[in-house]
């Protein structure tokens, strides 16, 4: 495991300088395989487990995705895998000449899965682990995006808030490309 192998960890982590200047494009994907610690990994996998099955099932539903439902599992995996590099694009462009910028984890892709759920079920009660307050998913999503945006502008700490933001937006938009009617379904659910 990369937790105990610093050399492997360093080869897999996202480093914008190495991607941009050394053409190590595999880092756009590989950073999702390593995490900053056990808690980081456990939280990402827990959230993926909580939301992933519903998204996978919905992608396989002929009502929501009449033209692509037979490829539901494939589309779910495709969206997740594409979300990994897409969520890293802001950091790539912003940090491309910074030797010292690194990031790890799958949080951007996991955020994509959460926001697909928000698109599909905007009234679903959502909250934060260990905090007993829940909000409708679309309100939670707005607050999450606002928080991620403002924290990314502060550019402090070791959390890739820009990856969370972009991953979330990608997870909301990707299913709409598959079925544009989902946006009407979303609007109907939040207005009725």
Model-assigned labels for residue ranges:
Residues 1-192:
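A detector for small-residue-rich transmembrane helices and their helix-helix packing motifs
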């Amino acid at each position: 495991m990369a937790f105990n192998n610093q050399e492997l960890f360093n080869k897999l982590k996202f480093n914008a300088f190495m991607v941009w200047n050394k053409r190590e494009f595999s880092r756009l994907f590989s950073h999702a395989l390593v995490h900053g610690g056990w808690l980081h990994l456990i939280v990402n996998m827990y959230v993926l487990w909580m939301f992933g099955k519903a998204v996978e099932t919905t992608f396989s539903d002929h009502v929501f995705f009449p033209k692509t439902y037979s490829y539901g599992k494939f589309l779910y995996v495709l969206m997740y895998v594409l979300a990994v590099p897409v969520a890293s694009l802001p950091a790539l462009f912003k940090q491309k000449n910074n030797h010292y910028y690194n990031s790890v984890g799958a949080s951007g892709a996991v955020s994509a899965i959460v926001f697909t759920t928000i698109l599909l079920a905007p009234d679903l009660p959502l909250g934060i682990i260990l905090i007993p307050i829940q909000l409708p998913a679309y309100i939670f999503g707005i607050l999450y995006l606002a928080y991620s945006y403002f924290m990314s502008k502060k550019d402090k700490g070791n959390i890739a808030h820009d990856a969370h933001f972009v991953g979330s937006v990608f997870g909301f938009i990707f299913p709409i490309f598959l079925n544009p009617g989902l946006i009407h379904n979303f609007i109907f659910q939040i207005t009725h």
